[in-house]
């Protein structure tokens, strides 16, 4: 700890980030890492044995292709086959009509690249067009490197083998031989979330970060999509299982902030918590067996009173609703999403995005051809890889690519100087490469915030030490050239994406926040009563709120990287946005607490007050886009005598008023958090 205290704050934050990423627990991560690791070693063995070129490209296919579950791996493998046909076909067309004419070749390749980048952003199968764009621009380097058309054709045909045999390999490993099914990952994930919930129910633990809670909720939703596509039994009983996922998410996120020591430890409360934990354990056992859980628990009057006293009544109701739900309930028909985004042909940003990518590639190609420096062809690949919809995400990808390339270059340098002279055969080579590939595979299976570092590290290492050589290599020039090519491409892309039609999210962020607060207002309008339909709607919208707040958080991080904005305005926007996100999360949990007390009352007394809260929140959200939002001030009216039996409800609603008053005032020249107390609210 003393060593960390002596380090600069940015270094400490970087170390904390990598610790979080490398220690991430995710169902399916270990099998995916092992599959990727074994696949990389097999690719090296096969490529070296049969002298197949472009080993780095084969490794890249594996890193992009092997996914967290068998269904996703199979789906990506099919896309890769289609992409290989399209990309090789486009290359042959370019070579046929313009092999000896670089200008004509670029004129033909340019529209292909633009079309691919446009479709990558607007089409559901954007990964296919991304692969075609990569090969279309990479293939322009073949005629420049070689003067013999026959050799270029052979290299292009080799690209078919290089792309397809790793695809076959990952299908055998990840789909046929050692499949990791989404259904088993879902069972494990649900049980892990319930284990965390029980721990917070029985012990006084520090709450987990809200960002982690939201990511876990989104991970369950993604697994649910894969289970629907991959498992017939899950599809048959999908309504029950989707309700199970929503219930587990609610229990997990709510108990994360639960502190059992803040309530009196009466015998009735202790027994109720034990009973609730026992029911959760029964649900876990049913999930492990892959069965729909049915409960015969009927809450007695004393248990209901104990649940209300320890603020667990709503959790109890959601659990019982799941246990009494018919497993054969017909699912709600899901709307099929369109293949293209709605504004694909009306929003000029998509075409501008394609033009910017083409411009960056042409600048790099001109420099690459002008200096006649064959080794820096990675600059053009970099322009395509780091091309993202907005400035912030492009900078994020640039940092990841540069970081991965730097680590890969350092490893390649050490490998060439210290290890390569001592190697005599392929077995020794595989033993030395094994820890490098294992590290890259583990990083590549982390979250999207850092996974590309692992991919880029291994690809850069392979480009510098294993590319098109089938024996010991001691040329350090390759390491220098690949790294410089990536740096050149990163610099050119940064300049283009910053100054040519920059797509800033600074204006989109307030709209995103308004959408999240609008969903929160919908939650407040749902009748607070023990009714199945209302409860299910409440849980589903609550999951949507997790996704909305997480998206706003990620957008804040991207806006922080947009250096073309005024620094003071950017800092003010980020500070206000983070305050809204924080207060929105607190409002959601505070509103959960009002449900526990309001359920015991006649619901007819509640809609007016709930509507008052929702109206104030909608008014605040409506002014975010124009920066006209002020902190809502809500006055609570006198409590009717019929509600005096539950004074806790009044205190909880007063707390909601305080949270409303702490929302930032967007009309102020500087962010001054509201410290004054809301009218009608008490501390």
Swiss-Prot record:
This protein's UniProt keywords: Antibiotic resistance, Cell inner membrane, Cell membrane, Membrane, Transmembrane, Transmembrane helix, Transport
InterPro entries: PHBA_efflux_AaeB/fusaric-R
Highest taxon above the source species: Bacteria
Pfam families tied to this protein: FUSC
GO annotation terms (biological process): response to antibiotic
Gene Ontology MF, one: transmembrane transporter activity
Compartment list: Cell inner membrane
GO cellular component: plasma membrane
Spans through the membrane: 43-63, 75-95, 100-120, 125-145, 158-178, 402-422, 426-446, 457-477, 483-503
Topology versus the membrane: Multi-pass membrane protein
Main function: Could be involved in resistance to puromycin, acriflavine and tetraphenylarsonium chloride.
Assembly and binders: Could be part of a tripartite efflux system composed of MdtN, MdtO and MdtP.
Entries under PANTHER family matching the protein: MULTIDRUG RESISTANCE PROTEIN MDTO, P-HYDROXYBENZOIC ACID EFFLUX PUMP SUBUNIT-RELATED
Family: Belongs to the MdtO family.
Name of the featured protein: Multidrug resistance protein MdtO
Gene: mdtO
């Amino acid at each position: 700890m003393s060593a960390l205290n002596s380090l600069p704050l940015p270094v400490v934050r970087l170390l904390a980030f990598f610790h979080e990423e490398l220690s991430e627990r995710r169902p399916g991560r270990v099998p995916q890492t092992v599959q990727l690791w074994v696949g990389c070693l097999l690719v090296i063995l096969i490529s070296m044995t049969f002298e197949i070129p472009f080993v780095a490209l084969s490794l890249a296919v594996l890193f992009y292709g092997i996914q967290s579950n068998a269904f996703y791996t199979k789906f990506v493998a099919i896309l890769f086959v289609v992409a290989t046909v399209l990309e090789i076909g486009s290359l042959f067309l370019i070579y046929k009509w313009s092999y000896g004419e670089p200008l004509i070749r670029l004129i033909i390749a340019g529209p292909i690249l633009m079309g691919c980048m446009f479709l990558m952003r607007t089409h559901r199968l954007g990964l296919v067009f991304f692969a075609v764009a990569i090969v279309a621009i990479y293939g322009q380097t073949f005629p420049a490197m070689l003067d013999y058309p026959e050799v270029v054709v052979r290299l292009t045909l080799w690209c078919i083998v290089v792309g397809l045999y790793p695809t076959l390999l990952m299908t055998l490993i990840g789909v046929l031989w050692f499949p990791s099914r989404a259904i088993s990952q879902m069972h494990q994930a649900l049980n892990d979330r319930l284990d965390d919930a029980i721990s917070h129910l029985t012990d006084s633990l520090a709450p987990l970060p809200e960002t982690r809670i939201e990511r876990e909720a989104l991970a369950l939703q993604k697994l649910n999509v894969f289970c629907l596509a991959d498992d017939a039994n899950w599809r048959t009983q999908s309504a029950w299982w989707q309700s199970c996922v929503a219930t587990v998410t609610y229990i997990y996120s709510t108990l994360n902030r639960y502190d059992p020591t803040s309530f009196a430890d009466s015998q009735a409360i202790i027994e109720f918590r034990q009973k609730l934990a026992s029911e959760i354990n029964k649900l876990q056992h049913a999930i492990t067996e892959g069965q729909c859980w049915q409960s015969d628990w009927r809450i007695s009057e004393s248990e209901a009173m104990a649940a209300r006293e320890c603020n667990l009544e709503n959790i109890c109701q959601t659990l019982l609703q799941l246990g009494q739900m018919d497993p054969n309930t017909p699912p709600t028909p899901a709307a099929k999403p369109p293949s293209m985004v709605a504004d694909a042909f009306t929003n000029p940003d998509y075409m501008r995005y394609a033009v910017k990518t083409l411009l960056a590639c042409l600048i790099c190609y001109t420099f690459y051809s002008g200096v006649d420096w064959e080794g820096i062809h990675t600059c053009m690949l970099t322009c395509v890889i780091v091309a993202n919809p907005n400035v912030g995400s492009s900078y994020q990808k640039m940092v990841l690519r540069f970081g991965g390339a730097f680590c890969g270059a350092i490893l390649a340098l050490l490998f060439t100087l210290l290890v390569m002279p001592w190697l005599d055969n392929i077995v020794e080579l595989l033993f030395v490469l094994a820890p490098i590939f294992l590290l890259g595979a583990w990083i590549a299976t982390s979250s999207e915030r850092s996974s590309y570092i692992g991919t880029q590290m291994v690809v850069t290492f392979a480009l510098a030490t294993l590319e098109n050589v089938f024996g010991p290599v001691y040329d350090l020039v390759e390491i220098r050239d690949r790294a410089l090519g990536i740096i050149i491409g990163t610099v050119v892309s940064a300049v283009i994406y910053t100054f040519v039609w920059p797509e800033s999210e600074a204006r989109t962020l307030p709209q995103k926040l308004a959408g999240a607060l609008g969903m929160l207002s919908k939650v407040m309008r749902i009748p607070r009563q023990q009714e199945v339909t209302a409860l299910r709607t409440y849980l589903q919208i609550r999951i949507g709120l997790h996704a909305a707040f997480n998206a706003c958080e990620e957008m804040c991080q991207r806006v922080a990287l947009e250096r073309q904005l005024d620094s003071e305005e950017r800092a003010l926007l980020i500070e206000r946005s983070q305050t809204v996100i924080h207060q929105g999360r607190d409002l959601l949990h505070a509103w959960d607490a009002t449900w526990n007390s309001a359920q015991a009352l006649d619901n007819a007394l509640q809609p007016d007050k709930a509507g008052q809260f929702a109206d104030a929140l909608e008014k605040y959200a409506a002014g975010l886009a124009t920066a006209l939002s002020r902190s809502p001030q809500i006055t609570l009216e006198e409590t009717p005598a019929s509600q005096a039996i539950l004074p806790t409800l009044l205190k909880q609603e007063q707390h909601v008023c305080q949270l409303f008053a702490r929302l930032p005032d967007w009309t102020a020249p500087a962010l001054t958090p509201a410290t004054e107390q809301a009218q009608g609210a008490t501390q």
